Structure formats: C-alpha cells, structure tokens
C-alpha cells in the first residue's frame, strides 16, 4: 500500500485494455491474400466442418479468418477483406472475411440478413 507522499509523486497508472484484433493495427478492416483455405471442426458440444482461410494481411501478419455463410468461392491467392469478430467454437479464429467484397462473392439465394452476407436484393 503506497503512502500519500508516494501517490503525490507517482500517481496511479491506468490499466491498458487488451486489444482483441491486434493484426488489424487499429483499422476497421484489412485487405489480405488467402494462403490456405480449409475446413476445421469446432470445440466440444458442437459438430460441423467450419470453413476457414489462412490470410496474409497487408500489415504483414498472417491470421485465421472464418468464412461465414453457405458455400464460398475462395481459393489460394484470393483477395479478401477481413474484419474483427471471433468464432466462439473455433479456437484461434478471431477474424471474419467480409462477403461480397473484393474476390469474395456474396451468399447465393440469401433472403434475410442479406447485408451481412453481401447478397443483392432479388428482383
């Protein structure tokens, strides 16, 4: 416990909040190139084949990013836009690929929540 004199001299230091999306370097999104596109299985109570891409960002960092929605057209060397947002049942996946931008196509035949999946309005 510091004395009042020590507090007058030094003061209290504020704790730094931990950055959850360090690879984006403070940007809302980052462009990157897919180095590997693969499927992986989720943590214990869930069961599926989740689509994930390994992406080298323009910041020079390589991250794992989740590909949301049903079906995708991504392969190695595809240009993608990456945003923050983890996938709770995939350990180590803290980023998501934005559908409908750069080389990523939107989800086909999507009727609801279209803006999240880059799907155009059906005529």
Swiss-Prot record:
Which gene carries the instructions for this protein?
rpsL
What are the 3-methylthioaspartic acid sites (modified residues) in this protein? 89
Q: What does this protein do?
A: With S4 and S5 plays an important role in translational accuracy.
Basic residues composition-biased segments: 9-19
- Source taxonomy: Bacteria, Bacillati, Actinomycetota, Actinomycetes, Mycobacteriales
Q: Which UniProt keywords apply?
A: Methylation, Ribonucleoprotein, Ribosomal protein, RNA-binding, rRNA-binding, tRNA-binding
UniProt GO cellular component terms? small ribosomal subunit
Instruction: List the protein's name.
Output: Small ribosomal subunit protein uS12
According to its UniProt record, what is one Pfam family this protein matches? Ribosom_S12_S23
